[in-house]
Amino acid sequence: MIQQESRLKVADNSGAREILVIKILGGSRVKTGNIGDIIVATVKQATPGGVVKKGDVVKAVVVRTKHGLHRKDGSYIKFDENAAVLINNDKSPKGTRIFGPIARELRDDDYMKIISLAPEVL
């Protein structure tokens, strides 16, 4: 579960390494986010020469959580880290590569570009 002030790793090559959650979008009183939720965050660590810089306010979609996710078939999936992919306003990723596995639930939320760039979909 992702909440305000959570720090997430960035799973793409947009130039950001770590982001801090400012707000979870969707409704007026959403307190926690899970895989597939859009968040507003600020860049806390960045690589030199990247698309985004430290201090930039960005939108991102959560792709991995330590908390995990229950699926309809009864299975349960959880990851070793909390990670997100930076996106534009039209839900397309800012980076050109995605690192690490991505949950299959992103397919239901129309993130097909992220799914196609991911090396592994679980």
Swiss-Prot record:
Keywords noted in UniProt: Ribonucleoprotein, Ribosomal protein, RNA-binding, rRNA-binding
Pfam families (UniProt xref): Ribosomal_L14
Sections of the chain in a coiled coil:
none
- GO CC entries: cytosolic large ribosomal subunit
Record flagged with keyword Transport:
no
Please give one Gene Ontology molecular function term for this protein. large ribosomal subunit rRNA binding
Q: By its UniProt entry, which PROSITE patterns does this protein fall under?
A: RIBOSOMAL_L14
Q: Extract the Gene3D superfamilies matched here.
A: Ribosomal protein L14
NCBIfam families, A to Z: rplN_bact
Quaternary structure? Part of the 50S ribosomal subunit. Forms a cluster with proteins L3 and L19. In the 70S ribosome, L14 and L19 interact and together make contacts with the 16S rRNA in bridges B5 and B8.
Q: Of which family is this protein a member?
A: Belongs to the universal ribosomal protein uL14 family.
Q: What is this protein called?
A: Large ribosomal subunit protein uL14
Q: Which organism is it from?
A: Limosilactobacillus fermentum (strain NBRC 3956 / LMG 18251)
